[in-house]
From Swiss-Prot:
It is found in: Cell inner membrane. PANTHER family: UPF0060 MEMBRANE PROTEIN YNFA. It comes from Zymomonas mobilis subsp. mobilis (strain ATCC 31821 / ZM4 / CP4). The chain crosses the membrane at residues 4-24, 29-49, 55-75, 84-104. This is UPF0060 membrane protein ZMO1566. It is a multi-pass membrane protein. Keywords: Cell inner membrane, Cell membrane, Membrane, Transmembrane, Transmembrane helix. Its main location: membrane. GO terms for cellular component: plasma membrane. Belongs to the UPF0060 family.
Length: 107
């Protein structure tokens, strides 16, 4: 299912953005930016395969998936597990993304 491409797209974007975070906030080498930029390019390319009917809706749906993946990143990479409010908020976002992507457009 093409909708699953949002997951690797989110992982690529988060990885790319984290490389900048690591460089600036964690004082890592600027060499961290090289794989980060490659990840951001991969993210942009993957998002073009979205099943959404236009770019704006693709980005809106992606936003819901991005939130889930960001919380997973925080938990697994940065050792900060989500609390119950994070999970409730993420569930709302996921429902919203599903509505935007899959609900019929005609009445």
């Amino acid at each position: 299912m093409l909708a699953l491409l949002y997951i690797p797209a989110a992982l690529a974007e988060i990885t790319g953005c984290f490389s900048f975070w690591a460089w600036i906030r964690l004082h890592k080498s600027p060499l961290w930016l090289l794989p980060g930029i490659a990840s951001l390019l991969l993210f942009a390319w993957l998002l073009t395969f979205s099943p959404a009917e236009n770019a704006g809706k693709a980005y809106a749906v992606y936003g819901g998936i991005y939130i889930i993946m960001s919380l997973l990143w925080s938990w697994k990479v940065e050792a900060t597990p989500p609390d119950h409010w994070d999970l409730i908020g993420a569930a709302f976002c996921l429902v919203g993304a599903a509505i935007i992507l899959w609900m019929p457009r005609s009445l």
